A protein has these predicted regions:
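Intrinsically disordered, low-complexity segments
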Residues: 1-2, 18-20
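Bacterial N-terminal signal peptides that target proteins for export
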Residues: 1-9
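Bacterial N-terminal signal peptides
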Residues: 8-18
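Flexible, solvent-exposed loop/hinge segments and secondary-structure transition points
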Residues: 19-153, 157-161, 165-180
Length: 180
């Protein structure tokens, strides 16, 4: 029975049902991203936004992509007052979620972007500092479009596109709800 051809026939069936390997890497925790993006900060005040349907619609119209019902964001303070805002966001790469942090100065200009978690097998090049640097200086109203002012990464097109779309959405969120 152990050498029976029936057992050999069952091997492919077992492999089909086996879980496929996944690739998940956490590069930074939220607190590590906070310190990396705002080294002079003395306090991070949780200001998570709970968006109304009207706010979600306005942000979606401004960004071309709508937000979820809540948006994690921290007001960043230092010895001299508000230093800026730190958003934590998730977008889908090709199949899996990408978690990233976006740092804005007090006026809403991007000062940095860090990838916290990347779960895709391929496309991790979005962690490349030169690619992330393209976002620095962008603000609400900036183009922030893949293939326009943000270069695509070959092999990571969907990850590049979705992070870019997410940044544009967060800039619109700042402009609609936090500016002032």
């Amino acid at each position: 029975m152990a050498n029976s051809p029936v057992w050999y026939a069952l091997i492919p069936v077992a492999l089909v049902g086996a879980p496929s390997p996944s690739h998940a890497t956490q590069y930074l925790s939220v607190s590590q991203a906070q310190r990396a993006l705002f080294p002079a900060a003395t306090v991070f005040v949780d200001r998570t936004l709970r968006l109304t349907p009207a706010q979600r619609k306005a942000i979606g119209q401004a960004a071309g992509i709508g937000p979820g019902a809540t948006q994690p964001v921290w007001e960043v303070r230092g010895p001299s007052g508000r230093l800026g805002w730190l958003f934590i966001d998730r977008v889908t790469g090709k199949h899996e979620l990408i978690t990233y942090a976006l740092a804005l100065d007090a006026a809403g200009t991007v000062r940095g972007l860090e990838i916290l978690d990347y779960r895709e097998t391929y496309g991790g090049e979005i962690r490349n500092p030169a690619w992330r640097q393209q976002f620095v200086g962008k603000r609400a109203g900036s183009v922030v479009r893949l293939g326009s002012d943000i270069r695509n990464i070959s092999g990571a097109t969907l990850s590049s596109r979705h992070v870019t779309d997410g940044v544009r959405r967060l800039l619109a969120t700042f402009n609609q709800l936090l500016r002032g």
